[in-house]
Amino acid sequence: MVKVSICVPAYKNPVGVERLLESIKVQSFTDYEVVVTDDSPDGSVEEVVRRAEVPGIVYVRNAVRKGATGNWNEAVRHASGEYIKIMHHDDWFTDRDCLARFVEMLEEHPEADLAFCGSRQVMLDGVGNRTGEEFDRAISDEHLKMISEDWRDLYIGDYIGAPSATIYRKGAPEYEEKLTWIVDVEFYMRLLQRNPRFVVSKEPFVSIGVSENQLTE
């Protein structure tokens, strides 16, 4: 069993998928597999995956479209790793040690099932290229105290952030496919209901691509 399954639910974003895979290839932590589940109607993502030459990559072309959340779950179903690391196709690791830092959080805190970090919000244009505008975002001390004392305060706001900013232990519940919005928040709440312990770093281990093409920012 590998330590980490990097799960990439992809849909029609070859530019983003290529950038993400390139960021994975240079990671200093190498005990991982990459699972790409492709919900695209064409072969553009598959072509990128085939030429990327990423070690330990598993490519799955969905025979029937799963939809956004269904594709998240499909990627996790194919995962064999001890830890699940969702990475959306708009996002990428900020530097070569970021996957190692994610793993360290759970390795050093066996009592926790969930860990999350800050993020670098990077503006993208209509075709997925960086515009040059970016800023870092992380949970505030006030909000960290709130959800540490009561995870139900996530009802007020998504203080954890995008799924790409998280890592969790295999065996977590699936994402709720009946929802269109706040899918990630609802998932975090069910995960913390089972085990309210979590680990956090305010450092931006991931860069989140922000564009008008996203389902949510």
Locate predicted features.
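N-proximal low-complexity "stem/linker" segments adjacent to membrane-targeting elements
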Residues: 1-23
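Cell-envelope/extracellular polymer assembly enzymes that use nucleotide-activated donors
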Residues: 2-5, 33, 186
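Short, acidic, metal-binding catalytic loop of nucleotide-sugar glycosyltransferases
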Residues: 22-31
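Conserved nucleotide-sugar donor-binding catalytic segment
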Residues: 117, 139-217
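Short aromatic/hydrophobic "clamp" motif used to bind/position activated sugar donors
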Residues: 84
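Conserved donor NDP-sugar-binding/catalytic core segment of glycosyltransferases
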Residues: 97-132
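A conserved acidic beta->alpha catalytic loop
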Residues: 30, 38-46, 64, 88
